[in-house]
From Swiss-Prot:
The LHC complex consists of chlorophyll a-b binding proteins. The gene is LHBC. This is Chlorophyll a-b binding protein of LHCII type III, chloroplastic. GO terms for biological process: photosynthesis, light harvesting. Residues 1-45 form a transit peptide.
């Protein structure tokens, strides 16, 4: 059984997937299809089922049944598509890829929004400004912007240089992921794997890989909502997420979404 699963996974992973190319959902686009066939169509994580027709579903308040095109072959498919956004195979393939990529960046972004406040509060790392939406403005100060508050690490004084360097780094990673360069990817532009994208071999086992996909998409969705919450907090309270959390814990009645929503006025 194990050899059958690994063979099926290998055949599926090597095949090129058309996530952003507009080619629709080809037969090779989902490694899970072949894996599920080798395991009688059931891949379970704990006591729950996340794939196939018997998976956990959430239809929402306006859907009577799961659409036929949402058959549970992809991670994070709860059968909910009231607006029919996934009815077109090409749009579905593109939107699914965009969701995964945005979820990954949101997870990194959410960590970056909280981590400086944590370091300054509990580790003792001194930042000129630990709050995420205020930190960038430090580059315009006389001393410039220091990475981790240490001028001996990365000292930035040019906003154009910072933007250019960020575009270069993100572009290289995305280019490697999409093009599948030798030694970088395995031909799958959404889950490239290989020594650079999976150096610990976490996805070597196909069943574990299927579970990790579910965990990734669920945490990615949560991170995207978290980032949206951070944006709203920044506009309404002018404070970072950690400070807002402690304010709420200190006085939940005076510091909550309802109170701020009823008192908020733009520009105040």
């Amino acid at each position: 059984m194990a050899s059958t699963i690994m063979a099926a996974a290998s055949r599926a992973v090597v095949a090129k997937t058309p996530f952003l190319s507009g080619q629709g959902r080809a037969a090779s686009a989902s490694p899970l299809r072949d894996i599920a066939a080798a395991t009688n169509g059931r891949i379970t994580m704990g006591n729950d089922l996340w794939y196939g027709p018997d998976r956990v579903k959430y239809l929402g308040p306006f859907s009577a049944q799961t659409p036929s095109y949402l058959n549970g072959e992809f991670p994070g498919d709860y059968g909910w598509d009231t607006a029919g956004l996934s009815a077109d195979p090409e749009a579905f393939a593109r939107n699914r890829a965009l969701e995964v990529i945005h979820g990954r960046w949101a997870m990194l972004g959410a960590l970056g929004c909280v981590f400086p406040e944590v370091l300054q509060k509990w580790v003792g790392v001194e930042f000129k400004e630990p709050v995420w939406f205020k930190a960038g403005s430090q580059i315009f100060s006389e001393g410039g912007l220091d990475y981790l508050g240490n001028p001996n690490l990365v000292h930035a004084q040019s906003i154009l240089a910072v933007l250019g360097f960020q575009v270069l780094l993100m572009g290289l990673v995305e280019g490697f992921r999409i093009n599948g360069l030798d030694g970088v990817g395995e031909g799958n532009d959404l889950y490239p794997g290989g020594q650079y994208f999976d150096p610990l071999g976490l996805a070597d086992d196909p069943v574990t890989f299927a579970e990790l996909k579910v965990k990734e998409i669920k945490n990615g969705r949560l991170a995207m909502f978290s980032m949206f919450g951070f944006f709203v907090q920044a506009i309404v309270t002018g404070k970072g997420p950690l400070e807002n959390l402690f304010d709420h814990l200190d006085d939940p009645v005076a510091n909550n979404a309802w109170v701020f929503a009823t008192k908020f006025a733009p520009g105040s």
